[in-house]
């Protein structure tokens, strides 16, 4: 009897050991499958516990040590596949979440799985990498550029550009009085300085030329906003830029002849100072007493004007004789550069004698023809 009971007890123990081994194999396979799913989800851009090592439930000491690996070949493949996904997903060591943070970057179209992003703006892959860094200029030393030009021949337009990041107010002065009453505007913009964008304040002043005297000093002042506008502004507390208003146009010389053909007039405009003038008639150069000249000084809207006049002496017209050319040369000194220059020469031809002689000849011929017709007209017989 005791032998029978011992045999039954051994059989029960064998069945129990077989049951425990099957349970361990099933749990290990389930854990490996979940590990493979975790690796796949990590590569798609989510953070989970795939980077932690895969563990299986503890087994009893009575189970064979190789039952976990030999019970199912899919378990080893699942673990190998999960390890492969963990290697692709990457991740920084010591990361609190264990995996890589692959959230799409706002400045990129598609995220790279091998890049790691953080919120550090100094990092090359930081989120603020696309923002242009504008250098900060000293608020007390702005850079000013001033230019003056002519707009549509009737307006003087001045432009003042101030490179600054501070809140400044721009004031204009022509001579001593301010010009706040005229049309002006201020805009904020960005300019490129040596390939670097900088903030700038641009003020534009537009004044009719009739209200401006050329060669007057114009000043652009960039002042703090707490100063009072107008004549009360202390320019010592501002950053200023000044220049001289140029003439509205370019210097020009023209020769005009009177309707009777007895005078040649040379007019030179847009002069800074009174020039010297010389006349040449054909190959002969006239002396200073051979012509007269009048100087008109600088006035609002115009620079100096020189008018010179030469008397044309009539000569007996002969067929085939060449007409005389009148040459007016004006040499002006530039007060700003102290450079003498010869203005473009103006040529004109006097053909009034030829026209008058031709007209007189045609008239005489017409009269002779009429007289001949009257004399040769047959007379009627009177009975």
Swiss-Prot record:
Transmembrane segments: 354-371
Gene: US4
GO biological process assignments: viral process
Biased composition (Low complexity): 24-75
Protein name: Glycoprotein gp2
Described function: The glycoprotein gp2 from the avirulent strain Kentucky A (KyA) is probably non functional since this strain harbors an in-frame deletion of 1,242 nucleotides in gene 71.
Membrane topology, record value: Single-pass membrane protein
Signal sequence residues: 1-25
């Amino acid at each position: 009897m005791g032998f029978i009971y011992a045999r039954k007890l051994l059989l029960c123990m064998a069945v129990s050991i077989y049951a425990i081994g099957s349970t361990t194999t099933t749990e290990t396979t389930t854990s490996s499958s979940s590990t493979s799913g975790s690796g796949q989800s990590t590569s798609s851009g989510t953070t989970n516990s795939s980077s932690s090592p895969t563990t299986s439930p503890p087994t009893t000491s009575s189970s064979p040590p190789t039952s976990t690996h030999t019970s199912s070949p899919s378990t080893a493949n699942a673990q190998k596949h999960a390890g492969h996904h963990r290697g692709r997903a990457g991740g920084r060591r010591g990361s609190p979440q264990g995996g890589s943070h692959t959230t799409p970057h706002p400045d990129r179209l598609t995220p790279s799985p091998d890049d790691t992003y953080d919120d550090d703006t100094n990092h090359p892959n930081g989120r603020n990498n696309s923002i242009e860094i504008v250098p900060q200029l000293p608020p007390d030393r702005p850079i000013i550029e001033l230019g003056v030009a002519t707009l549509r021949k009737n307006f003087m337009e001045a432009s003042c550009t101030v490179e600054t990041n501070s809140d400044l107010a721009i004031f204009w002065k022509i001579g001593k009085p301010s010009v706040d009453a005229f049309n002006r505007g201020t805009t904020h913009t960005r300019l490129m300085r040596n390939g670097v964008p900088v903030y700038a304040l641009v003020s534009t002043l537009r004044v009719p030329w009739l209200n401006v005297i050329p060669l007057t000093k114009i000043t652009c002042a960039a002042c703090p906003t707490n100063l009072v506008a107008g004549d009360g502004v202390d320019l010592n507390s501002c950053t200023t830029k000044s220049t001289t208003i140029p003439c509205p146009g370019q210097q020009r010389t023209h020769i005009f002849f009177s309707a009777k053909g007895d005078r040649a007039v040379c007019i030179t405009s847009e002069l800074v100072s009174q020039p010297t003038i010389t006349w040449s008639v054909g190959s002969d150069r006239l002396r200073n007493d051979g012509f007269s000249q009048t100087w008109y000084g600088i006035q609002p809207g115009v620079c100096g004007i020189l008018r010179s006049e030469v008397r044309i002496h009539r000569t007996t017209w002969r067929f085939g004789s060449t007409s005389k050319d009148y040459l007016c040369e004006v040499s002006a000194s530039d007060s700003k550069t102290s450079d003498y220059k010869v203005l473009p020469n103006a040529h004109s031809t006097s053909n009034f004698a030829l026209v008058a002689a031709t007209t007189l000849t045609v008239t005489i011929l017409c009269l002779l023809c009429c007289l001949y017709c009257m004399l040769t007209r047959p007379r009627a017989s009177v009975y």
